[in-house]
């Protein structure tokens, strides 16, 4: 299996081989989401695909590790990430703030990773019920792909472990506001002795990523995959790469989360300087934990790519202080991050131009 280990080669393969598959799958789920009967469930399902395409594109890159099974791997990644983004929307905009409801919704993610698990009524603790089979179809798609993987049993324990952290996080961070931090702090104490030194909000960030799951699934398509490789991937991605991923996500969303009253883990740092120090710590530790993993250079590119792609977001450019921090982080992490930063800015401009052209065409048709 040939895996790109240089930035230009990686981006060429991503644009040529991965993004078309990602958008093909997203189009399928977009059509299904538009057929949902319940108006609230439909609104959140369509919004999650429209507003969070970026998550699917990023996750899809790991399908490059699946060799000849890219189509199947992308199918899983998009279905699973779509569940994640959809449920996040439902919880973020929930009026119930009921932990039992959030726990039941996220049982779908654990079922999606458990081949043979029976489907449940994941909406049983909320008013909105009729999603026209949307969530069940997403779960079944994940199960079907995993069921076709010869080495599924080797990765299953790690998939469920990482998913367990994610689901616990989603429950605790969405409950009534005054309960969120105490619940997250208490949850952190359950695992603190097993973790490297970090704060509760950093552990929460480490729990909030799907990258480890995608990496495990992608590699497990390989005929020579082993249990030791599965363990190495888990240890390489959790906690540091996953933590860096989500801390960057929260970094660029700080202003938005403040306005909407959403929990933001980056806001718990005492100062911008402390936040910068810890982000740099996560960058270096992520690199350190990648030593000895198959295709080590590829994973280092992913690590640097996260920095470049997130920090090239328009939200960063629109905030003076954030822009200053972004430049400092890019400089500290080297030329590869700078490459991905420039590439990310260019890709976003291209997307805007495409959107403007399509909007003009639609306007002409209407006229």
Curated annotation (Swiss-Prot):
InterPro entries documented for this protein: YtpB-like
EC number assigned by the record: 4.2.3.130
The keyword Lyase belongs to this UniProt entry's keyword annotation: yes
Regions annotated as coiled coil: none
Keyword hit for Hydrolase: no
GO molecular function: lyase activity
First-tier enzyme category under EC: lyase
Pfam families: DUF2600 (PF10776)
Alphabetically ordered keywords of this record: Lyase
Protein function: Catalyzes the transformation of a linear C35 prenyl diphosphate chain to form tetraprenyl-beta-curcumene.
Family: Belongs to the large terpene synthase family.
Protein name listed in UniProt: Tetraprenyl-beta-curcumene synthase
Lineage per the UniProt record: Bacteria, Bacillati, Bacillota, Bacilli, Bacillales
């Amino acid at each position: 299996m040939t895996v790109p280990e240089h930035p230009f080669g990686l981006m060429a393969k991503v644009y040529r081989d991965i993004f078309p598959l990602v958008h093909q799958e997203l189009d399928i789920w977009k059509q299904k989401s538009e057929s949902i009967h319940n108006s609230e469930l439909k609104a959140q399902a369509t919004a999650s695909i429209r507003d969070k395409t970026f998550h699917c594109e990023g996750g899809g890159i790991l399908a490059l590790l699946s060799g000849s099974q890219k189509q199947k791997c992308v199918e899983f990644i998009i279905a699973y990430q779509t569940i994640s983004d959809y449920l996040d929307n439902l919880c973020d905009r929930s009026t119930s703030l009921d932990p039992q409801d959030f726990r039941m919704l996220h049982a779908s993610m654990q079922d999606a990773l458990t081949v043979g698990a029976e489907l449940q009524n994941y909406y049983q603790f909320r008013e909105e019920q009729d999603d026209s089979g949307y969530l069940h179809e997403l779960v079944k798609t994940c199960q079907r792909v995993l069921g076709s993987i010869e080495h599924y049993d080797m990765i299953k324990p790690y998939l469920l472990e990482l998913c367990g952290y994610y689901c616990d996080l989603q429950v605790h961070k969405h409950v009534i506001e005054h309960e969120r931090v105490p619940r997250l702090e208490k949850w952190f104490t359950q695992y603190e002795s097993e973790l490297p030194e970090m704060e509760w909000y950093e552990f929460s960030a480490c729990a909030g990523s799907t990258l480890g799951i995608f990496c495990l699934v992608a590699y497990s398509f390989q005929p020579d995959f082993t249990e030791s490789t599965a363990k190495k991937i888990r240890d390489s991605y959790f906690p540091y790469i996953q933590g860096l991923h989500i801390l960057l996500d929260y970094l660029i969303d700080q202003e938005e989360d403040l306005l909407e009253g959403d929990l933001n883990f980056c806001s718990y740092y005492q100062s911008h300087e402390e936040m910068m120090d810890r982000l740099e710590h996560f960058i270096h530790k992520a690199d350190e934990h990648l030593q000895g993993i198959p295709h080590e250079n590829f994973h280092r590119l992913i690590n640097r790519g996260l920095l470049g792609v997130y920090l090239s977001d328009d939200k960063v450019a629109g905030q003076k202080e954030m822009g200053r921090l972004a430049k400092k982080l890019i400089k500290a992490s080297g030329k590869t991050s700078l490459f991905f930063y420039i590439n990310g800015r260019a890709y976003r401009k291209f997307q805007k131009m495409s959107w403007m052209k399509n909007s003009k065409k639609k306007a002409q048709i209407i006229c």
